[in-house]
Amino acid sequence: MKKHRWILMMSILFLCPSLCLAAPAKVEVVPAVTAEAAVVMDMDTGEVLYGKHEHEQRPPASLTKVMTGYLAVKQGRLQQTVTVSETAASTGESSLNLKTGDQLTFENLLYGALMKSANDACVALAEQMAGSEAVFVQNMNLQACLLGCSNTNFCNSNGLPAENHYSSAYDLAVMTRAAMQEELFAHIVQQQKYRVRWSDGRHLLVQNTNRLLREYPGAIGVKTGTTNEAGQCLIAVAEKEGKRIIVVVLKSKNRFYDAVALLDYGLSAERKSGILNNRTETGQLSASA
């Protein structure tokens, strides 16, 4: 009887060699991140490659400035001179330290807003474009709606804490995807340094707050954001071999570490950059930087 069983088993194996040769199923390793919400999006197709509470409404801090910058570059008033109002000059936290009556070109304010995360520059731009920040915010929300961002409501142009001011990781990726189609926006957010110039000859060298531009091969933008309520936030874009990936992380314990893990995941499952270790960023939080 045992001999017959052995012959039967050998016959089955002989007739079905695929049973022996079948490779084990490949298990995709999803990156572990500290962010409470995150998304990875293919910038060319809009496909979501990874999501973690990506539709959850959260304070976006200075990631708000992506929409402000997007609307600004679409208006194309680059060489127009802007006179800084008292309202803009009094806007606190991260800023260019603008004074009432200062004059700068629209372009210089735009660089200050997107690279240095200057809150005062955002208000000056908003007032120049729409007459008041309140009216400009209506335009921001309209544009968000047109892009299909259903979990977004802006209350100001810079992302400073405000009741009912929120967005989601997914919506912010959608906004970034649209903004990066604008050549000037894509150029500005990729710059590491820029000298902001006032009309009277004063100038200020600003450095991009996005350190991935200096540390992650292929990084081409976009924006940092930090408030006590929002935590560490970041939108990052990188490209490799023709593939472009958008990463958004919200309320992260280490936004740059999380972004690297998600960019690596989106660009190539095998790629290991190893440029950032898993250390939590510490220090005073600068509101909406």
What label would you give each PLM region?
Residues M1-K2, A113, A287-A289:
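Soluble, non-transmembrane domains of envelope/secretory-pathway proteins that act on or interact
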Residues K3-H4, N278:
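N-terminal cationic leader/targeting segments used for protein routing and processing
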Residues H4-A23:
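Sec-dependent N-terminal signal peptides of Gram-positive bacterial secreted proteins and lipoproteins
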Residues L13, V29-P31, A238:
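Sterically constrained small-residue positions within well-ordered secondary structures
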Residues L19, N139, T209:
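Non-catalytic cell-wall polysaccharide-engagement segments
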Residues A22-Y170, V174-E183:
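Active-site-adjacent loops and short helices of periplasmic peptidoglycan-processing enzymes
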Residues C149-N153, P161-A289:
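Domain-terminus/edge residues, biased toward the C-terminal soluble/receptor-binding domains
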